[in-house]
């Protein structure tokens, strides 16, 4: 190294030494704590009461903040140290100061559930209705924590139990319900909280899947009651408390629309209970025990949403969940499963023949799986789609009419044979995957009740057309039950044509795929019966 380099290095070392000396002096003279905070804040963080007293005897700024605006009082409250809080308040600490995140000490006290510290702060002049800069009232913070004593302290000091946060217009009772804090709900109710208040965020944008073109219409985010939050989150204790306290069990969230609703439309929808109920929210989130409890408390199983979907259809749908898009299926942790709930719903008066009036609301986990299901779909038709034989049997015994069809005259038999089936993916709750065996079992159940094996829909397709994609065993079974082998659909194609890949398309009727084995079977069956194949 050159002499110039040595001199430069020596100067750098000398400068660094001077910085170290200055920092040491700052620390020893109390100008700066080793954490970057003031010595007072550092002492409070350590919980060192003697050091705090020493600092307070000096001429210091008790409200001097750290780099993020957090003061010594914030840290004392966070530590739930009432003695330190008292010392700092007596020394002139500002009880209303907020850090750069908009948090005042009283919000931290509510997070801790500290009634004593809340009393100290309110006695020092803090408003019990303080909110964060994000608009979260402190009573809501305490409700989310479930801190009953803290809530009582705030209420005693004038906290508004019906205050709303600014993002979604939710209230304390909604947050308590979502977190399953039943005791907190009781405290709020006793203080006059509106158990049927609704959140005010009402927009429900409709999304589109570019590949399929199928609509994915999320559940409406607004107009929710506390019971709906409890139902969604499986908060059964909170839901039971709300029911016992008189919450409306049949209130519905606002129906889904492509455009924002006008005020008069909102009022009309709420008056008619057109929308998703807490019972349905519980079911589509796989909280079957909670749903059963709501039924016992008097929930109406026949309340339907804007698509005509009620609790029974939802339970049938969830029992054999279809296309799981991009995420695992829900995990069943309840004592009851979907088939159990179907029985309970029927016993409680659910209409087994209730039809959808439109496309069912998409729930992100089944996007596209029921695109061809909409107006006219019954719970039985939905169960037939996945050959959920146990549920089909329960529905039929409960009064389901197997002769009801979709508007295009597609029968439950065609659906059971594979008409329009889109497949199932994912793992989680019990998933019924249609197989040739399950199709045969489902079709046997329907044919034994008198369905026409050769019934055709508006496109001219029969169960045999649909069976081609389900497998040889299904084709052979239908033939054994007398199904015609060479009926042409409106496009002029027979089941054999479909097996040969003609007239293929979406809907489980060939898709352009050549099924050589099935084609050979159909030719054999037609030859045995003396039917002309019409094939080359």
Q: Which ranges hold each PLM region?
A:
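Bacterial N-terminal signal peptides
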Residues: 20-30
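N-terminal segments that cap or nucleate solenoid repeat domains
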Residues: 34-75
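Ankyrin repeat A-helix N-terminal signature
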Residues: 42-46, 75-81, 108-114, 141-147, ...
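Ankyrin repeat structural motif
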Residues: 49-56, 81-89, 114-122, 147-155, ...
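Ankyrin-repeat boundary/linker signal
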Residues: 65, 98, 131, 164-165, ...
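Ankyrin repeat start-site detector
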Residues: 67-68, 100-101, 133-134, 167-168, ...
């Amino acid at each position: 190294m050159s002499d110039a380099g040595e001199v430069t290095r020596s100067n750098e070392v000398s400068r660094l030494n001077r910085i170290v000396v200055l920092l040491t002096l700052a620390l020893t003279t109390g100008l700066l704590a080793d954490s970057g905070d003031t010595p007072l804040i550092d002492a409070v963080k350590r919980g060192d009461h003697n050091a705090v007293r020493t600092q307070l005897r000096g001429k210091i700024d008790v409200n001097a903040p750290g780099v993020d605006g957090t003061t010594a009082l914030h840290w004392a409250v966070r530590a739930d140290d009432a003695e330190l809080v008292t010392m700092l308040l007596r020394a002139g600490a500002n009880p209303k100061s907020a850090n750069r995140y908009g948090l005042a000490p009283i919000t931290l006290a509510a997070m801790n559930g500290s009634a004593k510290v809340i009393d100290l702060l309110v006695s020092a002049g803090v408003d019990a209705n303080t909110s964060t800069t994000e608009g979260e009232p402190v009573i809501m913070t305490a409700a989310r924590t479930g801190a009953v004593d803290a809530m009582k302290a705030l209420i005693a000091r004038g906290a508004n139990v019906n205050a709303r946060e600014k993002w979604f217009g939710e209230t304390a009772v909604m947050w308590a319900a979502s977190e399953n804090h039943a005791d907190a709900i009781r405290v709020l109710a006793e203080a006059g909280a509106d158990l049927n208040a609704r959140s005010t965020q009402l927009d429900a944008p409709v999304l589109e899947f570019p590949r399929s073109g199928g609509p994915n219409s999320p559940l409406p985010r607004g107009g929710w009651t506390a019971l709906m939050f409890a139902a969604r989150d499986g908060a059964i204790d909170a839901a039971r408390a709300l029911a016992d306290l008189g919450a409306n069990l049949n209130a519905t969230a606002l129906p889904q629309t492509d455009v924002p609703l006008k005020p008069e439309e909102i009022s009309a929808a709420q008056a008619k209970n057109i929308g998703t109920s807490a019972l349905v929210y519980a079911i589509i989130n796989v909280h079957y025990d909670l749903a059963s409890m709501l039924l016992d408390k008097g929930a109406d199983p026949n309340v339907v949403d804007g698509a005509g979907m009620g609790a029974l259809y939802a339970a049938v749908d969830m029992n054999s969940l279809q296309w799981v898009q991009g995420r695992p299926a829900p995990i069943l942790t309840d004592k009851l499963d979907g088939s159990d709930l179907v029985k309970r719903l029927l016993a409680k008066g659910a209409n087994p023949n209730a039809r959808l009036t439109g496309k069912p609301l998409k729930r992100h986990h089944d996007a596209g799986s029921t695109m061809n299901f909409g107006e006219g779909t019954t719970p039985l038709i939905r169960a037939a789609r996945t050959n959920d034989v146990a549920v089909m049997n329960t529905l039929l015994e409960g009064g389901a009419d197997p002769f009801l069809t979709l508007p295009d005259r597609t029968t439950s038999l065609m659906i059971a044979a594979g008409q329009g089936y889109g497949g199932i993916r994912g793992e989680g709750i019990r998933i019924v995957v249609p197989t040739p065996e399950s199709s045969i079992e489902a079709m046997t159940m329907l044919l034994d009740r008198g369905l026409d094996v050769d019934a055709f829909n508006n496109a001219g397709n029969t169960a045999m057309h649909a069976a081609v994609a389900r497998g040889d065993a299904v084709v052979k079974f239908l033939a054994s039950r007398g199904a015609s082998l060479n009926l042409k659909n409106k496009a002029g194609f027979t089941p054999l044509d479909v097996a040969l890949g003609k007239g293929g398309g979406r809907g489980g009727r060939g898709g352009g795929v050549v099924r050589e084995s099935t084609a050979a079977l159909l030719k054999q069956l037609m030859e045995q019966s003396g039917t002309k194949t019409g094939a080359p």
